Amino acid sequence: MSYQVHITSTAEHDIMRAADYIEFTLKNPNAADNLLDAATEQIGSLADLPQKFCLVDDPVLASWGIRFVIINNYLAFYTIDEEKQSIIIVRFL
């Protein structure tokens, strides 16, 4: 069963800031596009198997069910709501 994937406005802002930094500060628009493509692909893949990535090492965050996926040089942090069959992307750092 597929889960719904939701991205918080904070995480969305994080993703756009990272892409803007790569495109405008590092002057590499291709790398920025690659980051956005990789983020879309990896985050979308969570819908089919959300538990495939581990909990964070921090015991407090792990107790909240915070997991992470590595996307290029960034981490996307997310939680799983089993009751609502949804995944919430909370940050992208």
Predicted regions, residues:
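Arg/Lys-rich, positively charged N-terminal/basic patches that mediate binding to nucleic acids
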Residues: M1-A38
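Short aromatic/hydrophobic contact patches that present stacked aromatics
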Residues: Q4, F68, F77
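Generic beta-structure capping elements
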Residues: T8-T10, L49, V90-F92
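Enriched for short, Lys/Arg-rich terminal
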Residues: L26, I71-L93
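Short, hydrophobic secondary-structure boundary micro-motifs
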Residues: N34, C54-D57, I87
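Short, charged/polar surface micro-motifs in flexible loops or helix N-caps
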Residues: E41-K52, L75, E83-S86
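A short, surface-exposed loop/turn module that caps and links secondary-structure elements
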Residues: I43-V69
